[in-house]
Amino acid sequence: MNATSASLGGDTRTPIAAPHATHKFRLLLRREFWEHKGGFFWAPFVAGAISLLLTLMAIIVGEVVARRAMADGKINIDNDVTINGLDLGALTSKMSAHDLEQFGHAVDLSLVTSSLWPFIVLGFVVFFYCLGALYDERRDRSVLFWKSLPVSDRDTVLSKAGSALVVAPAIAIGVAVVTMFAFLTLMSIVVLFHGGNPFTLLWGSGNPLSVAMHFVASLPVYAMWALPTVGWLMLCSVWARSKPFLWAVMIPVFAGIFVAWFDVMNLFNLDTAWFWQHIVARSLTSVFPFLWLTATHMNHFNGPEEIGSLLSLRNTYAVFATPQLWIGAFAGIAMIFGAIKLRRWRDDN
């Protein structure tokens, strides 16, 4: 009877299971996003909007200038067709298959350039995010609060690295794709206004879907290529007592200056150009997209006709076969590991 009463009166609530490690990591990624939403989302969004606004302003100026020129004369096409105003339908009828192919390359190039602004902003956002990721929490003493929670230093640092390597570039890619299609829509309106067929002249000759898929497929390349800069900046962020920007920039820059001085003095047989390219530049600029093209010898772009090879997934993923990527990636992983170790005891101001 007593045993029965004890069992009936006892606490029969089911114990709550501990959250899974992946769920905890997702929460950390979400926290990083909401704390840095201005940089991760709004900065590339505003950059894309500004690029579209400048494009619209350029179109308006071009229309005004063209109409003033039309008021003074006529447009002659191959000394055969003479029209008043700009008739893109008549222009298209005079284009050969080779001309349309070349025009398609030019369209693809314009799509890439129209979407570059969010990627440029991404480089600066990731750079300064990593630089302050572990320093700001020590400066405002919030690191003491976060360390009181059941979250390891490993998960905290890795969530910040994951935000820089995956979350921020994924958002920038999405914004860049939206900007690209908005630019294409804007140009389609201009083509329609001048009597052309945008589906034939722009959407058909160009490859907007291929360009968009290339941006999406380049995400793992960016994550691997940016590792040395992310690792170096986070290591400086957790190590520096003050002015992490100066430490992060001046150490590799002064190292490059010393190497150049040793080279001039013939003290050591050092390749100054190699050191600046593979050590200094890789440690500071790898967070800017598409710089991996230098490793695959695709940095020499000779015109719109080469846009196809530039957007080739085979050429993009060829960087995985280069030692520059893997050496930099291992160095970045080692520095992130060092940042984890340093955060365990570095909570000073």
Walk through the language-model features, giving the residues of each.
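Short, membrane-interfacial amphipathic segments enriched in basic
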Residues: 7-27
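Transmembrane helix segments
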Residues: 56-57, 211-213, 243-293
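Membrane-embedded or membrane-proximal helical elements that form or frame transporter/channel pores
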Residues: 66-130, 134-137, 305-320, 327
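Transmembrane helix boundary and interhelical loop/hinge segments in multi-pass membrane proteins
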Residues: 129-147, 158-161
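Short helix-to-coil transition segments within interhelical loops
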Residues: 148-152
